């Protein structure tokens, strides 16, 4: 746990404003994104709140009264088809071969629109043959929504091709390192592919939604494929619809 790495044997009395501020600085030095730090702080705050409710900490000493969790607005970074193709065609060799699983997992999630948390919870049981075609059926860790994906129809079945690479040890494919380390792998991978765009694993999900909408897939269908409970959540991609309109009208020239 990062907090224990920062300071071993922490007691409730140690959880002061000064310690939390120092922990934030520690995470910054480790290179964590502002919003990633915010996730760790929210997790810590939740435990502090429980401790206060159980009277392990006096309410007067509530550290988060002064400390404000900082976040920045996330832009939905996505890859355009040409950038995705560069990653698909990237050949890793030498000391970079060890990055292959991170690359393949990222590409698979570009085709399936999955979150990191859902990908690492997959097993072979999530893949089902329906009418002799491969479907991926899973329950979202974040929302609890069941998602049903016809992999054979998504992105020309490229996700199935990746699964076939790992068919002898499929469970290992889903056992990635932690999200932050995989994101570090992706920074190296994009540099090797000649891409200047900074991506994270979640970029795969945004890429999936963006390219589906750009290629004319109905937003309600995209909502179902992403496992969004409400179409309003999917409408963050409406800026892509403008691109789609331009794309369609240019065909008429």
Question: Which residues make up each language-model segment?
Answer:
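Basic/aromatic-enriched alpha-helical hairpins
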Residues: 1-30, 49
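N-terminal DNA-binding recognition helix of tyrosine site-specific recombinases/integrases
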Residues: 2, 29-63, 117
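Basic, Lys/Arg- and aromatic-enriched nucleic-acid-binding interface segment
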Residues: 34, 38, 57-116
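C-terminal catalytic core of Y-nucleophile DNA break-rejoin enzymes
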Residues: 73, 141-188
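Catalytic-site neighborhood detector that most strongly recognizes the C-terminal catalytic loop/helix
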Residues: 78, 140-144, 226, 230-251
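Short, basic (Lys/Arg/His-rich) helix/loop patches that form interaction surfaces
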Residues: 94-96, 167-172, 176, 184-224
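C-terminal catalytic core of tyrosine-transesterase DNA break-rejoin enzymes
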Residues: 107, 111, 118, 205-229, ...
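Short, polar N-cap/turn motifs at the start of nucleic acid-interacting alpha helices
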Residues: 127-133, 196-197, 217-236, 243
């Amino acid at each position: 746990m990062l907090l224990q790495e920062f300071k071993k044997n922490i007691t409730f009395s140690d959880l002061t404003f000064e310690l939390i501020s120092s922990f934030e600085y520690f995470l910054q030095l480790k290179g964590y994104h502002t919003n990633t730090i915010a996730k760790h702080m929210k997790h810590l705050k939740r435990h502090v709140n429980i401790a206060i409710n159980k009277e392990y900490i006096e309410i007067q000493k509530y550290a988060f009264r002064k400390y404000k969790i900082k976040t920045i607005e996330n832009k939905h970074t996505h890859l355009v088809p040409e950038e995705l193709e560069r990653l698909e065609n990237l050949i890793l060799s030498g000391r970079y071969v060890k990055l292959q699983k991170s690359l393949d997992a990222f590409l698979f999630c570009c085709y399936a629109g999955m979150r990191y948390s859902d990908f690492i919870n997959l097993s072979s049981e999530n893949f089902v043959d329906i009418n002799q075609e491969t479907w991926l059926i899973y329950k979202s860790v974040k929302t609890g929504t069941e998602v049903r994906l016809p992999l054979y129809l998504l992105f020309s079945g490229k996700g199935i091709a990746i699964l076939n690479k790992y068919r002898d040890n499929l469970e290992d494919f889903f056992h990635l390192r932690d999200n932050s380390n995989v994101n570090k792998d992706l920074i190296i991978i994009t540099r090797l592919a000649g891409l200047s765009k900074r991506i994270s694993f979640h970029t795969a999900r945004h890429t999936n939604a963006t390219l589906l909408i750009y290629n004319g897939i109905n937003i309600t269908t995209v909502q179902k494929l992403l496992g969004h409970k409400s179409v309003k959540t999917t409408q963050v991609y409406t800026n892509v619809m403008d691109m789609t309109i331009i794309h369609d009208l240019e065909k008429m020239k």
